[in-house]
Structure formats: C-alpha cells, structure tokens
Amino acid sequence: MFCPAPGIPLLATTYNLAESNNAGRADIVLPGFVASFMRKLALLVVVACLSFIVLASAQAGPGQTGQNPQIITVSQIHAGMRGVAYTVFEGVKPEAMEVEVLGVLHNVNGPKGDIILVRLHGTKVEYTGVVAGMSGSPVYLDGKLAGALAFRIGEFSKEPIAGVTPIADMLEISALDRSPAEETSAVKPSLSAVAGQTATPGETNSLPGSAQDSDGKDFANYLKPIETPLVFNGFSEQAIHLFAGQFASAGIVPVMGAGSVSDDKQPEPLEAGSAVSAVLVRGDMDIEATCSVTYVDAQRLLACGHPLLQFGSVDLPMNKAEVLATLASPLNSFKIVNTTEPVGTFVQDRHTGIMGVFDRQPEMIPVTLSIHSSTGVKQFHYEVLNNPKLTPVALMVTVFNALHGVNEFGEEITYRLAGSIGVKGFPEVTMRNMFAPAENGQPAAMQAAISLGERFGRIYDNPYNAPDIAGVKLDFDLVRERRWARLESARTDVTEARPGDNITLETVLAPYRGERIVRQIQVKIPTSASKGTLRILVSDGETLDHMGHANPAFGRKLDLASTIALLNKEHSNNRLYVSLLEADPEARVGDKVMPTLPISIMNVMDGMRGNQEMVVSGESSVDETATAPLDYVVSGVQLLTITVK
C-alpha cells in the first residue's frame, strides 16, 4: 500500500494519485468497472494513510496520563511538521484538528518565551477560526505532547493560525507548590486593591503604558492570548457595563450570559482537550471562565497555556464544562458553555497556564444578601473568591446587581443597611448605614456597593495579616422615597463659655422635597478645655471619616486588628455629629488617639514620627456628640467658634 512520506500534505498525495490514474488512461484503456475500482482504491489508500498519521500523532493524545508525559521540545520542532490538536466544539468529547507547524517564534512571550506558530486544518476549525475558549487545547507532534494552543494572530484573520505555548514551560508550574512564602504572596494587596484606591465604576486604575491604557490599547494585536472571557450569569447589562472598568484593570473581559453554572453530574472524565472552568462567583449569581485541558493525570491538570489573571497562587473552584455550541464570528468566535460539577481546585495561575488539583475544596467567601420591602423578603446566596484584587470588585458588582435587579428598584429609593463581615480570629466588621441618591446623581445601590468594596479593600490592604474571611451578611431595608437631607445651618446660643458649661446648638436640615427639620443638640464644654478659641464642627459622619483618612496616619499600613477597629469606629451617615476642636497637638498610634498632648510630650513623640503607626497632628478633637439616628442620609458641614474663658 502506498503512503505519503512524512511531511507531504495529504491533499497533494490525493491529487498525485488521481493524476497518476488519469495519466494511465492515455496509454491503457481500462474497463469501466476497473477504473471505478481504482478510484475507490485510491480513496481508501488516502483514508487509511490519514488514519495512520492521526493515530500516530495521537498515540499520546487525549487518553495520555501519567506523571511524566512524553514531550517534544522546541529544539526538536521545525517548519513543515504535522500533528494533531484536540478541542471540544460541541458536547464533552474533544475532536481532532490537523496541525501544520509554520515555525518557532523566539522570545515573543517574555524573555526566553518561545511560541510555536501553527496552522490548523479541519472543516470545523477552518469555519470558526481560532475560538475563545480553545486556549489550552493540546498539540501533539510525532506522537508527543508539544504544548497548548494559547495565542491568536490579530483581528479578522482569514486563516486559523495560532501560537502554541511549549509544554516544557507549562510543566514548570507543577514545581511551584504552595510554600509559606507563596502563601504570603497570594494575599498581598495589589495596586488596585489598596484602601482609598477602589476606582469608581466606569473608571480604571490602570498604570500608564498598561494594556488598559488608552494610548496603547492596540499594541498587542499582532500576537495575543486567545481570549478566555469571564461569563457573567444572573447579571444585568447595566451592572456589567458599570463595573467593566474595574474588571478590565484586572485583565478581565466581561461577557454577559453566554452559558450557565449547575451542579449537574457529568460522568465523562476530564481528558486532554476537555473544557474546564474556573469559577469566581457561584450561587444565585455566577462568574466563570472556561478554557481547555492540556495535560491531566490522577492528581492534577494543566490548562489554558496562558494566565487567567496571573495572580500566582489562587484558590478557585475547578469544574467540568460542556460546550453547547461554538459560535463562529469574523471578530471573535467563542464557545457557549455550561459549567457542571466541581472536581477540584485551581491552585496556580501562572504566565504559561493554570494548574488544578483534584479532590480539594476551594475556600470561598459565603455571602447572604437580603432585601426587605413592602412586598416581602428576597434573599440571595452566593460565594465569591478570596483574592485581594478581585474580591472587592466581585462584591461590588454582585451587591449592585442584586439591588438593581429587583422589581422594587427605582431612582427614588433609599436603603438602610445592617451588615457584618466575619474575619476569623478578629471581631466582626459591622456596617450600619443608609444610602440614598445624592446631589451628584449616583444611585443608592451604587453607593452601597462602593461602600462595601472600600471596606474589603482596607481589610486586605495590610502587610501583617492575611485575612481569613468567614462570611458576609447584608440586610437591606428598601424605602420607596429619597430620604436625603442637607445640613443648611447651625448656630449656638452663646459666644463665650467656661469649662464644664452646657451650650445648645440649633441645626436646620433641609430634606429632599420636604419641610425643614430643626434639631437642638446639647453640648458640654470639657472641664479640661483650654482657654481661648474653641472650634465647633457640625457635620455628617462621612466628613469626619474623610478627615481621618486625610490624616497621614491613614496612609500608613496598620495591622488587621487596628484596621478592623478603625472600620468599626467609622461614623454613621444618618446622624449629625458635633466635634470640639482645640489647637493642641494630637497623636495617633494605630487606631488609638491621644488628644491635647502637653508640649513636652509632643516634642518627644514628634521625634518618633518615623514609626509607621505614630503620627502627630496640630489639632485635637476633645469631644464628640451625635444625634439619635435621623432616618435620613445627612450631608453637610458647618463650623462655629466660641471663646472659652
């Protein structure tokens, strides 16, 4: 039986056989049935040779297991080699695609980061092109594992040309176990997670020259990772749109509802080429990303061929996945996926791929969110990943989505929040606030989401302790009116007072489209008050908190206990506060305040300013009084002065 030599295209072989048959007719006239037989024989020869080549290339294909896979190194790969790749186009069974090596691109994926450039052949792949979700699909050359499909070329490509991450680079991930140093790095805060730097929805925290920087957004169009879109299920289009900037700054491309998550059993085992999903949020709302398995054995698997987020050590649910359909698009073909039963945990997210281990449960953060209204109670139960960079954003988008996605939602809505964040080994972080549409037009639901995200950013932003979040509980009471009031004026009944005297402040609040409210506040001048000018600050709680944030102490890193203590001391926004300010030095040590220090003590402490938890300021708050809750979100500041005799 005739078979083509290695490296000769099969289509060319078919043409030569047919041409030889036609050439024979010039000299010899064969009976019709003989000619027909010869044509069928030629076709059978081609089919047999094709099967032989595919089987030879796939001998260590999807079924390959074991601790040491047979691999082929980049130095052994050259242009013209042919092999096979596997991916799922529909269902759960990987399908073969013919692979033709075009060459090797050196140092294009970082220092010493080589990429194998290949052209894919096959009816389906030539129709769909390189597909989002195909990254990780294993490539075999000479029957050995060469690597994973991981890169595509440009936009609107007319040919399915892809880049392959060498398997040797991916196997390095297996050597990265979760050492103590690695565990510590996994929870260190990133630039976009630090307190006070949680970007407003619609903005990003990307650095100049980053992939998200508008001036350089197209720099990587020549060769870039095959997209692994993060699919949002149970989310409104507005929620995804408003928070797209935050996810973009983390390297995520949000996609609305192109699949789902369920606990349905999928009896088929994972194999090389199978679809596998990493889950960031699961429950009544789902966020997941799907790529393909490159290598699998009894304990672990490697997938993607490029990073999901490149967070290093991670702790994400690893689920099987079923491809419902592959949608062809000139811009970007993608797979529509159902994520099914969990099988383990992704523990590494590295430059050349992600690694998961079987039979390990990930540590997620459980969230219970309740919305109380006149029509009853609606509850949402879900879990979010535990990650310094993404957890605050995931909580913001899920909270906004839950509040925005109920029928009771409207522009003239106020929420009363009673909530808590459980941190193992520390006191709960309590939250009691109100949120109403403000003068700047920001919806109450967005204010609530940002408030929660900012708290989580501060919990993660400490260099001393890795927070172990036990859970989040949020109870919202929905009021169908805008309960917001501005502090219009404040005055006192005296201009002079003595230490120990009681004075009365009269404040006027102007509610949104309502009658003015007058409140009288009794204030006692401290017996320790110094003679001279005493400033009286009448304000909302947010102003006092911002004054503390502006203090240099707020920019210094505190341990987790001090951070939680400060969070629990923050002021409610439905009260008026009266603060008495003296022109005496004040020292802050962590979450503790020492007001009105004598000059001698201040001079000593001033020399300790280098201490990361010691800050001396020139003004002291000697007393603070608050009204009872007003059932309005209060906004405004008034400053009065009296003379202490």
Regions found by a protein language model. Give the residues of each.
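Bacterial N-terminal signal peptides that target proteins for export
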Residues: G32-V45
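Terminal presequence/propeptide segments associated with secretion/organelle targeting
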Residues: A56-K645
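Intrinsically disordered, low-complexity segments enriched in serine/proline and basic residues
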Residues: L11-A12, A23-G24, L30-V34
